[in-house]
Regions:
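C-terminal cap/linker of serine protease catalytic domains
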Residues: 6-8, 20-21, 39-47, 53-55, ...
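Flexible, glycine-rich surface segments
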Residues: 119, 125-129, 152, 156-159
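Flexible glycine-/small-residue-rich
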Residues: 13, 25, 36-39, 82, ...
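Terminal peptide-recognition signature
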Residues: 21, 35, 75, 80, ...
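Short, acidic, Ser/Thr-enriched surface-loop or helix-capping motifs
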Residues: 13, 95, 130
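Short, solvent-exposed secondary-structure boundary/capping segments
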Residues: 30-37, 108-116
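Flexible, gly/ser-rich surface segments that form the specificity/activation loops bordering the active-site cleft
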Residues: 25, 45-46, 57-111, 120-123, ...
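Catalytic-histidine neighborhood of serine endopeptidases
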Residues: 1-40
Length: 208
């Protein structure tokens, strides 16, 4: 994690509204990092408002009462939020839907799950929601499709992975940030889920 700690990292609600963040902890094996906002002096009013709502900024995002206690189930519907490709297409948050297609990750990794929700480069670290608005996982770095294609002779389609909420919580707890489980139980529309995601997801930029 020392390499990440030497990089400048900023967060915000888009590429033009960024504030500096300190990298407190990293977990390379799970593609997780814990950030702390270091200054909001130059932030826009919208960014300050978003940071105020979050209270705690974690990359991937997790905070008090957001993570679901039960791990995802096979066939469960999910919604993924993030800022794929940064600001190349637009500065706005993007959401995609899908379902849990396997309850294990690459190489039978029990700490991850597979989903068919569309995930593009730059989506890593984005929250994955269940139908009630609870976070059930965090998008892990995208599958190296070229490498897989060379191994099996074809490009994998709709194969993406998430880190289970239980692993995210374990990382936060070991970093000295205990969290409470989320208990949302009312099913929401995708529009409602997107609204929640917009208020809980930030763009993270690592500057070389």
């Amino acid at each position: 994690g020392e390499g990440y700690k030497r990089q400048e990292v900023t967060v915000g609600d888009n590429a033009q509204k960024q504030v500096t963040a300190d990298v407190l902890e990293t977990d390379r094996s799970n593609d997780l990092a814990l950030l702390r906002i270091s200054s909001t002096k130059m932030a826009s009013a919208d960014t300050k408002s978003l940071i105020s709502k979050l209270g705690i900024t974690v990359v991937p995002l997790a905070s008090d009462g957001l993570l679901r206690s039960e791990d995802v189930e096979l066939g469960e519907s999910v919604l993924v939020a993030g800022y794929p490709y940064g600001d190349i297409f637009s500065n706005t948050i993007k959401v995609t839907g899908g379902m849990v297609s396997a309850n294990r990750g690459m190489g039978d990794d029990t700490g991850q799950f597979q989903m068919d929700a569309a995930v593009q480069a730059g989506s890593s670290g984005g929250p994955i929601y269940d139908e009630n608005g609870n976070i059930v996982g965090v998008v892990v770095a995208q599958l190296n499709k070229l490498k897989v294609a060379k191994a099996i002779g074809s490009f994998p389609e709709n194969v993406n992975f998430g880190i289970k909420a239980s692993n995210v919580r374990q990382f936060l707890t070991s970093s000295g940030l205990p969290t409470k489980w989320s208990k949302r139980s009312k099913r929401m529309s995708t529009k409602q889920l997107a609204k929640i995601a917009k208020n809980q997801t930030v763009m993270v930029v690592c500057h070389p």
